[in-house]
Amino acid sequence: MTSFEQIERTAMRLEIEELRDTPAMPDIFDRLAHKPYSCFLDSSLTMERLGRYSFIGFNPHLVLTTRGLDCSWWRRGGGMQATRENPLSALRRALEERVINEQHPGLPPFLGGGMGYMAYELGRYLERLPGNAVVDLGMPELCFAFYDRIVAHDHETGKTYLAVLHCDDPGRVLEEARRELAKRPPEYLGGSGTGESNFRSNFSRDQYMEAVKKVKEYIYAGDIYQANLTQRFEVELRE
């Protein structure tokens, strides 16, 4: 297995082609959604700064997940590796592994890289915060997948692009990506839904009203000026 000491920053080449006569982005994602860590950043806006583009990332070459200081690195073709470090430092290291030295004016701004999320609890690594949250979901606090295969759609021009990052053999890499996009989506069995009655909240009505009362008291005392009072809903999904 390759050690982190052996991994150097790799300058990647970018190959881009316009996809013609392709389905809409949700239909493209249907063909990829069953693959682990497929990601769809969807926007229907045409405003350039607020949502002009939609992106699909698939078949990532690296996935970084963290819980506390425990970091797990999965690499395509290289298996899993674990480190213990500050999760934000791990994320920075992952971002620096591959670099793109090319500029492509007029094309979508994201053509390869990381998509993921950072939980609110990661704020503990930026400032001293109390750890009062109940940890009962078992989800990573940080999860980022890094993609060298991106489908990008420009809602303003209506053009869709396939972009791949590679070190060599662009024809092979592009053809592999095309084949993945051409596969028929798996058949899913339809269901009748879950029904409203199956949703459960972590607040009772009385508990919620009491929380609202406390928020008002904090505001009146000058301790806060607003609050994001949330509740969590759970529902059992059918297979």
Identify the function of each model-found stretch.
Residues 1-239:
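Extended alpha-helical targeting/anchoring segments
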